[in-house]
Design a protein with these regions (language model features):
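N-terminal glycine-rich phosphate-binding loop for ADP-containing cofactors
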Residues: 1-141
Length: 141
């Protein structure tokens, strides 16, 4: 940020391509568009690198540090004020879209995505207040 003689301020950003400072411009990205995770644009690549790796990490936490997916979701919701935990988020995004992207990139599936796929489950939660267990069966929440 630079300060002008009249006291006003200009927000600037360092442009990595030109290696010079330039005025900051507001980027228009629809953060509610979950399809951006699967876009090959710079925005999509960044979104996947940040959020996709978070979901990947979470899908490997069960059963290592948590006994079930609800514990991971609640920890993220209660501890970090997420509106949805990572497993509920994956259900909204579509677990098989994530699986397809990981397989296309040659990445081994994290544990709970493997469980979901091997048991032909469509989601981590169902509409009967049940969750997919690490063993691949439906258990009460």
């Amino acid at each position: 940020m630079t300060k002008n003689e009249d006291g006003s301020r200009n927000k600037e950003t360092f442009d990595l391509l030109t290696k010079a400072w330039r005025p900051q411009k507001k980027e228009e990205v629809d953060i509610n568009d979950i399809n951006i995770l699967f876009d090959d644009s710079p925005d999509g690549i960044l979104a996947w690198d940040v959020y996709g790796t978070t979901l990947f990490y979470a899908a490997n936490l069960v059963p290592i540090i948590a006994d079930d997916i609800v514990s991971v979701d609640r920890a993220m919701q209660w501890g970090f004020n997420w509106s949805n935990g990572p497993f509920k988020a994956m259900d909204k995004i579509g677990p098989y879209k994530i699986i397809d992207k990981l397989e296309k990139e040659g990445i081994e599936l994290p544990y709970m995505l493997k469980v979901l796929k091997e048991n032909n489950a469509e989601s981590f939660y169902n509409d009967q207040d049940e969750q997919l267990s690490p063993e691949g069966n439906w258990i009460s929440i």
